[in-house]
């Protein structure tokens, strides 16, 4: 497939009007929307902003490639926008962006589409193409330039195989990967290959893109390589590099600093990889990684914890909503001895409560351990988490089990390094499961479970004994945490605490947490309705969507507004969410469902007071926004 089957005259804008990043993104999203490529403009924009929050797609050299792969895209497409004066896109080199290519990929985009999208990023690495695009005078000229240089993947591979690698100082290997696998993955690969050719160095680059792994490194190549560059912002297969010198960096380093990386690899200026199981690019030896993504124990702990929480959430949401639906027939409708007993309600409660929700601690522990030690950590983590559930050690016991199992397996990997390479196949199928489950199980049974269960029991009793003042303070803190970063670490920490308390049998904290999480989008929706002169027409349209997202407990619905005006929106959201959280505790509302938004309000002990708390919080936020935001003048 040619790139110009995705980039058409209808998705080209020769003169971008906006000068700042947020407005440029909005302008380019509008181009795709008007061309009929999107079914949910706001959801697509949120996906773009979410990708930008990870690292800027302004890669330098005057190029920005915002991209997202989401179900809000009808057909894969590329939009092109040009600014001869340049726009402030927060590019990695600090320079203005002149060429903006916005890539829209469908959730189920086939390989043909993805390969064409990926090929675009490699074309833009060539200076002569960028110059031609800047000087083109019409949409047709843009199309002609792309067609002139575009080659199908088969042609590229033939050309690559036909041209022997230059004689140099030894063959080095590289792996590139980014979260979406559309742009940065291939731009980093292309930058490394171009620079290696210039330096006279033989290189092979494996790309982990959306269409799968290409040019996969063989065991023999890995064995012979002096060093391996891993430029990746997502997990890649790392155990194959054990014992080799590996330079781990963010994918943007592959684009921005290819010569430095290649020279380090050739000089073997890289640590020996010990097989810890991590595949993230941000390593401690890379200064850029330290500056942008953090380092140290706290960052590592958070990464592993979020791996567990993100994989646990489907069980929480699915199981929790099934339990909530069963309450339509009555709170005790699953009890055969209660007059409200209903067979179908009992089945829903059994599926959601007795099975799905009973797995959450084990799943949490399993995926934490897997994040630490790769697949060998999964089984010991699951077993440890299940033991915590059985011993009433709850969520905290599961957290401990996950980290314990992960590092037990890391220790086992170091202990069994004496085993001959010919017997390596026994490690993942026999040695790690056997000793990992045994050691984790023994430690959980005789060291962890009893004191943690006692602590969880104490914590539950303490929370139940709190007076109104302390409860309100707790509600204010938890509600505010849900709005500070809207889906970020503090939001996830509060949500995780709420789930832990539900698991321990205390339903008050999660009432404040869910109320606080609903306020940001609802407050914005109200503000766009009441204070219409403070928002653009586009914002008012997006505000309608926020009513539904807020009602469904999707805090992230407020992110586009917060990203566009953080100094006004975030403080207002925190105050409103804190008010809602504090009121739920003042009214002593309890909520046994982990998810569901206003649709599970009826299962609280005080449904109307709970809804009132949410409404008051949203109104407070809307009023603050109405006061602090200035009227807008639309063109």
From Swiss-Prot:
Chain intervals for the UniProt region annotation (Disordered): 149-168, 273-293
Entry superkingdom: Bacteria
Annotated ranges, domain PTS EIIC type-2: 301-635
Residue numbers carrying Phosphocysteine: 178
Xref: Gene3D superfamilies: 3.40.50.2300, Mannitol-specific EII, Chain A
InterPro entries, sorted: Bacterial_PTS_Sugar_Transport (IPR050864), PTrfase/Anion_transptr (IPR016152), PTS_EIIA_type-2_dom (IPR002178), PTS_EIIB-like_sf (IPR036095), PTS_EIIB_2 (IPR013011), PTS_EIIB_2/3 (IPR003501), PTS_EIIC (IPR003352), PTS_EIIC_2 (IPR013014)
EC number(s) reported in the record: 2.7.1.202
Catalytic activity: D-fructose(out) + N(pros)-phospho-L-histidyl-[protein] = D-fructose 1-phosphate(in) + L-histidyl-[protein]
Feature: compositional bias, Acidic residues: 152-162
Any GO molecular function: carbohydrate:proton symporter activity
GO cellular component, one term: plasma membrane
Topology class, membrane: Multi-pass membrane protein
Chain segments annotated as transmembrane: 312-332, 350-370, 392-412, 428-448, 470-490, 511-531, 544-564, 569-589, 608-628
Keyword entries, A-Z: Cell membrane, Membrane, Phosphoprotein, Phosphotransferase system, Sugar transport, Transferase, Transmembrane, Transmembrane helix, Transport
Modified residues (Phosphohistidine): 67
A biological-process GO annotation: phosphoenolpyruvate-dependent sugar phosphotransferase system
Localization annotation: Cell membrane
Domain PTS EIIA type-2: 5-149
Annotated catalytic residues: 67 (tele-phosphohistidine intermediate), 178 (phosphocysteine intermediate)
Domain characteristics, as noted in the entry: The PTS EIIA type-2 domain is phosphorylated by phospho-HPr on a histidyl residue. Then, it transfers the phosphoryl group to the PTS EIIB type-2 domain. The PTS EIIB type-2 domain is phosphorylated by phospho-EIIA on a cysteinyl residue. Then, it transfers the phosphoryl group to the sugar substrate concomitantly with the sugar uptake processed by the PTS EIIC type-2 domain.
Protein name from the UniProt record: PTS system fructose-specific EIIABC component
Species this protein is from: Bacillus subtilis (strain 168)
Lineage: Bacteria, Bacillati, Bacillota, Bacilli, Bacillales
